[in-house]
Amino acid sequence: MAGNKDSSWDDIKNEGIDLEKIPIEEVLTQLRCTREGLTSDEGQTRLEIFGPNKLEEKKENKVLKFLGFMWNPLSWVMELAAIMAIALANGGGRPPDWQDFVGITVLLIINSTISFIEENNAGNAAAALMAGLAPKTKVLRDGKWSEQEAAILVPGDIISIKLGDIVPADGRLLDGDPLKIDQSALTGESLPVTKHPGQEVYSGSTCKQGELEAVVIATGVHTFFGKAAHLVDSTNQEGHFQKVLTAIGNFCICSIAIGMLIEIVVMYPIQKRAYRDGIDNLLVLLIGGIPIAMPTVLSVTMAIGSHRLSQQGAITKRMTAIEEMAGMDVLCSDKTGTLTLNKLTVDKSMVEVFVKDLDKDQLLVNAARASRVENQDAIDACIVGMLGDPREAREGITEVHFFPFNPVDKRTAITYIDANGNWHRVSKGAPEQIIELCNLREDASKRAHDIIDKFADRGLRSLAVGRQTVSEKDKNSPGEPWQFLGLLPLFDPPRHDSAETIRRALDLGVNVKMITGDQLAIGKETGRRLGMGTNMYPSSALLGQDKDESIASLPVDELIEKADGFAGVFPEHKYEIVKRLQEMKHICGMTGDGVNDAPALKRADIGIAVADATDAARSASDIVLTEPGLSVIVSAVLTSRAIFQRMKNYTIYAVSITIRIVMGFMLLALIWKFDFSPFMVLIVAILNDGTIMTISKDRVKPSPLPDSWKLKEIFATGVVLGTYLAVMTVVFFWAAESTDFFSAKFGVRSISGNPHELTAAVYLQVSIVSQALIFVTRSRSWSYVERPGFWLISAFFMAQLIATLIAVYANWNFARIRGIGWGWAGVIWLYSIVFYIPLDILKFIIRYSLSGRAWDNVIENKTAFTSKKDYGKGEREAQWAQAQRTLHGLQPAQTSDMFNDKSTYRELSEIADQAKRRAEVARLRERHTLKGHVESVVKQKGLDIEAIQQHYTL
């Protein structure tokens, strides 16, 4: 018998039985299960036979991953230098340059080791957190429904599939209404397909409409998804970040190539230099100029940053989303659950009944009948929770059919049989849908809309209830005319931190737009409470309709840019809003939690799935939040900007050092025919890399405005600073070699005509200023004002202590260096400090010439973080005073032509500034109302407003 069992399971595993085609009852027979599901013991037994319901993960070869860090264009240049050191540097009576070969190899290994360790650690931490977000599913085990990880599913399990779920395994649908299934990830079909009971649904597809049970027929690698995994495999594209990395790398390589070409042309045909001396000079440019640590520093910085984001409750599914979040200047936020608590309550005292023989309690019972008693959403839980006993929702009736909520119909409905055997249908949902369903007369419709507006003015949502008799006693029959029963006021209070979080976002130059499916009046009330402003429009305005007179002349694009939010929004509207903002060169973020948000999440530059989002929303997003509310997003923006700032700081530094090494040593080699030792420039590179690795954990001040890769700024800053440092070295060499300036002024012995001691002096001077440059590029203001992180400053002083000791004491003939003593070391340190000071001024001049905004940092020291508690107080008071004067007609409102030019962040930040101004005006208006005065007194006295509102209505 056991043998037959095993044979049967083998047939199922090997697809010997076509479970997709045979009748559903035969499927249950073959799988030895019933519609009541499996027991836990049977599930465990089958799990051992079929394995977990997940795809086999590709095992990563650690050795190949390690070697992969040595396989990039910058590493190839260093590897070319290593080959040159032993293959070409072999002449002039000297052996191959083995010390340089070994040094280059050690440098490559150090970079790869650090990258491997840090990225591995960050990856493991992120994987552990992602495991907590593993797909879940509703499964029927031991006769009870429970939410379990999808990995435990086995053939024969009964699962529930509802709107927003990603189908966890291949299955056959059981009895019920058809589902709408999106199979685009598997088959490429652009439109959802209708799946009827008995048909198969595939793992990885998304439920777009309906709710139904299914029996699992295949799991893991045996599913359609598993067999066609190559169709949906992640390509791990690096996108814009990789393009930037390539552009900077190419710039550095081209700079080195030009320098080498000039050296070859001048040294050999013109100066007739010895072959080996020329090779050594070329090696100096190759070894010192190539930013070998750049891929390591940037990837490690991003990996560590991703780990930090995950600790803050934002898990990055796509690493490059970090740089996009740093540049985000518009955030389109869902209202319900993100800006509000998504914990609805009904104000029973304000319930409006439209039928004479019905009271408020009976209206609530009818609404509860049109609600789920299991697997409830927020509205269902709110309505059923208003009953004394939740069982009243089904007491005395027999449920025939339940029509679940979907974003298109915006209502639920139940068909039931009462105690007398009569059939009825009750529906609850969006008022407009129910009003249209009931075909209300004009007077009744006007009364309903007046009540809805009254609710909306108080920040309450409206829920309508309708009822009809089904005389045909058939769930598919249209029934008698619908009767409008009444309206229920629902209130979803804002999160306690939403208003402050939105103000923080606006201060950071991120314009928050509310995108809600609720009515316009509710959106405006919520926006006013949250300080977002009330410049909101209905979704019809997106089509050029129903616009205010004040904005009638504005094109739709400008309207979207100027609005604080949109109400009555459908999924296609969200997608259109994001698309239009992107076309206007905005970096757009979008939050969402439902399946209807998935298209907009995928379209947005940064799709953010909020806490408790559906599987479909998580799948479409770039960042998954593990904590509710907007505050985690603002924290993630600041962290992303800090991460991005570290990466940008390093790229400017890398370009500067390349120019500095290439130009400086090329001039020394061609003007004075000075042959610097390749080994010593290798020591400079190793010490530099050791210090620079700590930049991934450096303390930085995030940009006060959205930031992005500005290659023009990076290259311009790098070229100017690098040229200055090169000239600084050339001047130092000239003074030490051709004059007695240092001897006369500081009493040190002359090293003129002593190439080995000159090598030591140049080595120390290059080492000090090359590393000190990072303090200039890492700071937005004066470098000596912004304190670096402990590890960076410690690494700098440790590296320079080693460099100084080498310059003072080293006597290495193979490296052509002889110690110069502490006197010269002190002179070089003083020279370096004096010529370091102009670097900040050069930085400001470059930024000012490129953007005109660098002096803001010099004069105002404007940063995202500050220790001053009253930062921006004067500016806020001025804005408040201006808002008051504008409100009372004492001065005309300021206008801005911000829509004409989007080329700089000054214009982009004006959007956020205008939103702040509108929010201040809205709050000012509120304080001139009785309600506003009461709330102000309550706040000043520290009273509990919620407790007061339970007994009094303002």
UniProtKB/Swiss-Prot annotation:
Under the GO molecular function aspect, what terms does this record hold? ATP binding; ATP hydrolysis activity; metal ion binding; mRNA binding; P-type proton-exporting transporter activity
**Residues bearing PTM Phosphothreonine:** T886, T953
Q: Which residues form the active site?
A: D334 (4-aspartylphosphate intermediate)
Positions on the Extracellular side per record topology: 87-98, 270-278, 671-675, 736-756, 811-818
GO terms for biological process, alphabetical: proton export across plasma membrane
What does the record note on quaternary structure? Binds to 14-3-3 proteins. The binding is induced by phosphorylation of Thr-953. Binding to 14-3-3 proteins activates the H(+)-ATPase.
The protein's name is ATPase 9, plasma membrane-type
Organism whose genome encodes this protein: Arabidopsis thaliana (Mouse-ear cress)
